[in-house]
Amino acid sequence: MKNFNLTHRIVMAPMARMRSYGNIPQPHVALYYCQRTTPGGLLISEATGVSETAMAYQNMPGIWRKEQIEAWKPIVDAVHSHGGIFFCQLWHAGRVSHQDCQPNGESPVSSTDKPFADDPSNEFTPPRRLRTDEIPTIINDFRLAARNATEAGFDGVEIHGAHGYLIDQFMKDSVNDRTDSYGGSLENRCRFALQVIEAVSKEIGPDRVGIRLSPFADYMESGDTDPKRLGLYMAKSLNRFEILYCHMIEPRMKTVSEIFECRESLTPMRNAFNGTFIVAGGYTREDGNKAVAEGRTDLVAYGRLFLANPDLPKRFELNAPLNK
Ligand SMILES: Cc1cc2nc3c(=O)[nH]c(=O)nc-3n(C[C@H](O)[C@H](O)[C@H](O)COP(=O)(O)O)c2cc1C
């Protein structure tokens, strides 16, 4: 990976913990990340909110306030002291939120005002469609959050463009029903994502920027009628900005946890993108090795296996038994 001296290809996938009380990461999280750090290993943080309106769920961390930046510093330092490379995943939940998580109890914002079709326990508040003139403010929130992440010491940021959150709500045609320059054609639907990438890259340098995408997933009612075209368009467009990496979720992961039989592959996107490619979703030691050996990816991110096995790289090296 350009400018980073990785010693192996096993990446810790971003995983929300929901233990950041008051949206401030707590000191105990340093231990959690350090347990999963190896010298020259890449870790991606839990989803971290870029602003007050970005938030959802309980106790997710943020990185828009001074207090949050200060709280991240010793955590990032701890990972660095173990030789790790640490990227902060920048997140805006969009409509996957509830008014109780929003400033002044307002509706969450989205590309649309469509509520979830299937939300029996009213987990989510119907969203308010962002006006075209409000969109630059959200892009600016990502830019400032990236600056804050570098101030906190992170080596770079991963823009969360996956899993039905705000950026995905713009990209996917089942969600985005806009009629302005951010809706309709594929080019228009991807405009927001690409403007975020551009702003963040200009702020901290493209060599410190990655993005996570899940064109094939329909998690949080975020399916697309032509995911291959979407994934390919994004992979090609990213080259304009020369960002560090593109992290894609395997088509077999329709949600974040269920694995489906699937014939689709990420190879066209991998071939279209010029930077480092990372895959994630249901990988084992064996098929991770196979994906690398066959040239289908550069790096493989592991989620649940890393959660249950903090020393995952060592266990893979020894081919040792794994905790479930
Ligand atoms: C507890 C948990 C929290 C997660 N939180 C995030 C997150 O904050 N951001 C994200 O992009 N993906 C998140 N994911 C998805 C994982 O990064 C990963 O893509 C998924 O678990 C599939 O990979 P795996 O089969 O190796 O676990 C989460 C998954 C789990 C299990």
Swiss-Prot record:
The modified positions for N-acetylmethionine read M1
Keyword terms of this UniProt record: Acetylation, Flavoprotein, FMN, NADP, Oxidoreductase
Give the span(s) annotated as Disordered.
Answer: 99-128
Polar residues biased stretches: 99-113
State the Gene Ontology terms under molecular function.
Answer: FMN binding; oxidoreductase activity
Which residues constitute the signal peptide according to the record? none
What is the active site of this protein? Y165 (proton donor)
According to the UniProt entry, what is the EC number of this protein? 1.3.1.-
Broad class of enzyme this protein falls into: oxidoreductase
| Binding-site residues for FMN, renumbered to this chain | P14, M15, A16, A47, Q89, R212, G282, G303, R304
Its function, per the record, reads: Putative oxophytodienoate reductase that may be involved in the biosynthesis or metabolism of oxylipin signaling molecules.
Per its record, how is this protein called by name?
Putative 12-oxophytodienoate reductase-like protein 1
Q: What organism does the UniProt record list as the source?
A: Arabidopsis thaliana
